[in-house]
């Protein structure tokens, strides 16, 4: 006599592990088997990718793919919960894979320690049923979207910044793709990065968990509840969830429309005028070389003539309060072109010039090295370039009274080249 009857292939240890899902309406045995036989690719093993991967692995997804070229840093740990202090310096994909294996040894995990690019995307995506966009930059979003449309894969997309996050599903059940909603990339200067705007760990946790939930709904064929053609927005500060309708599938879309013009992957860094990583490389020079000084030159200059300079830190006050160089004056870039700020800067310059003149018996013949230098600094040497251009124009009436210079590579450069004890964030 048989001990028990089961008309499915779930093993006893799987029934025990996934039991609470098995008895959930709209999941059941068929739903769990779909999960166990499915494969999901997660682009990004960071703030969003970690909760997505942890919850999908716990749910019993048969195969997970993790794509991330980056390594774990201590600054990641407040929000990237799949990594540990002991993982510092190792691949994020490998680190997250290790955590997943400790959580559920029944599933398979593939790691791709590479940048997701036009050259690698199609070969990786073709092996998976669903793709999750857990990236942090515009170029990757367009790339992932186009690759999913060209391969016919549903895309679950999420994003988070500061206290807010949002999630939707693209290329599913005749719904829109990312290009239907955003045909052209936003101007680079309008995009706020996580490293500049900040983000709370629980926010990416909420959005990542919701992304995992959308994947489960798609794989278990719960079509009606999927966020296709709808955008869910979460405001953590006010504790409000909103779901809004978004533009539907567009017949004129360049990639999923009736007559697509994008039939193969393109150069997305050129298309978006941005990199595949928000931390890729140094900040490019965008001002005349006469307005630039290196951190080494700045350090030597203030050593030689510590009193005859004015240092303006253009970071937001919330960042300035974390740490700053001695004798810095905080005037945020968002306020630097306002009348009140210009008046403050003019007053500071005039006071410095007057003090300098008083210290020189013969001002007309004084050494050029005694000329006042006005230095502008920010976190990475990006916003200080904008500031130097603004002040070069706003203060042109008495520009002959001082040198105006932006500090290349900013405070991160100061940490790397001058003082490694200076806090970075």
UniProtKB/Swiss-Prot annotation:
One Pfam match: ThiF
InterPro entries assigned: MOCS3/Uba4, Rhodanese-like_dom, Rhodanese-like_dom_sf, ThiF/MoeB/HesA, ThiF_NAD_FAD-bd, Ubiquitin-activating_enz
Protein name: Adenylyltransferase and sulfurtransferase MOCS3
Cofactor(s) needed for function: Zn(2+)
Principal cellular location given in the protein's record: cytoplasm
Active site: 194 (glycyl thioester intermediate), 378 (cysteine persulfide intermediate)
UniProt domain Rhodanese: residue ranges: 305-423
Keywords: ATP-binding, Cytoplasm, Metal-binding, Molybdenum cofactor biosynthesis, Multifunctional enzyme, Nucleotide-binding, Nucleotidyltransferase, Transferase, tRNA processing, Ubl conjugation pathway, Zinc
């Amino acid at each position: 006599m048989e001990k028990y009857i089961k008309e499915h292939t779930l093993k006893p240890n799987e029934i025990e592990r996934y039991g609470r899902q098995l008895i959930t309406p709209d999941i059941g045995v068929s739903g769990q088997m779909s999960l166990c036989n499915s494969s999901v690719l997660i682009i990004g093993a960071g703030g969003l990718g970690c909760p997505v991967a942890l919850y999908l692995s716990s749910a019993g997804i048969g195969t997970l793919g993790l794509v991330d070229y980056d390594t774990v840093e201590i600054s990641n740990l407040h929000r990237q919960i799949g990594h540990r202090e002991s993982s510092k310096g190792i691949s994020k994909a490998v680190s997250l894979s290790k955590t997943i294996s400790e959580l559920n040894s029944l599933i398979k995990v593939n790691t791709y320690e590479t940048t997701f690019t036009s050259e690698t995307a199609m070969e990786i995506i073709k092996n998976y049923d669903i793709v999750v966009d857990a990236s942090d930059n515009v170029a990757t979003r367009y790339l992932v979207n186009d690759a999913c449309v060209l391969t016919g894969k549903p895309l679950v997309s999420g994003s988070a910044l500061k206290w807010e996050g949002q999630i939707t599903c693209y290329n599913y059940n005749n719904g829109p793709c990312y290009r239907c909603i955003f045909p052209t990339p936003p101007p680079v200067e309008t995009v706020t990065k996580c490293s500049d705007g900040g983000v709370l760990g629980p926010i990416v946790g909420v959005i990542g968990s919701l992304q995992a939930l959308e994947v489960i709904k798609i794989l278990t064929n719960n079509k009606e509840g999927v966020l296709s053609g709808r955008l869910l927005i979460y405001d953590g500060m006010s504790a409000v969830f909103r779901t809004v309708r978004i533009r539907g599938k567009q017949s004129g879309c360049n990639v999923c429309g009736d007559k697509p013009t994008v039939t193969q992957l393109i150069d997305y860094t050129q298309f978006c005028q941005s990199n595949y990583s928000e931390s890729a490389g140094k900040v490019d020079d965008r001002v005349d070389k006469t307005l630039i000084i290196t951190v080494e030159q700045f350090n030597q200059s203030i050593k030689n003539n510590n009193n005859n300079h004015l240092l303006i830190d253009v970071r937001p006050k919330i960042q300035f309060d974390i740490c700053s160089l001695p004798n810095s004056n905080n005037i945020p870039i968002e306020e630097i072109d306002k009348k009140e700020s210009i008046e403050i800067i003019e007053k500071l310059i005039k006071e410095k010039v007057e003090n300098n003149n008083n210290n020189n018996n013969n001002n007309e013949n004084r050494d050029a090295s005694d000329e006042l230098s006005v230095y502008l600094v920010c976190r990475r040497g990006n916003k200080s370039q904008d500031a130097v251009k603004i002040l070069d124009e706003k203060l042109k009436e008495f520009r002959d009274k001082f040198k105006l210079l932006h500090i290349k590579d900013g405070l991160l450069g100061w940490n790397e080249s001058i003082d490694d004890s200076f806090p970075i964030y």
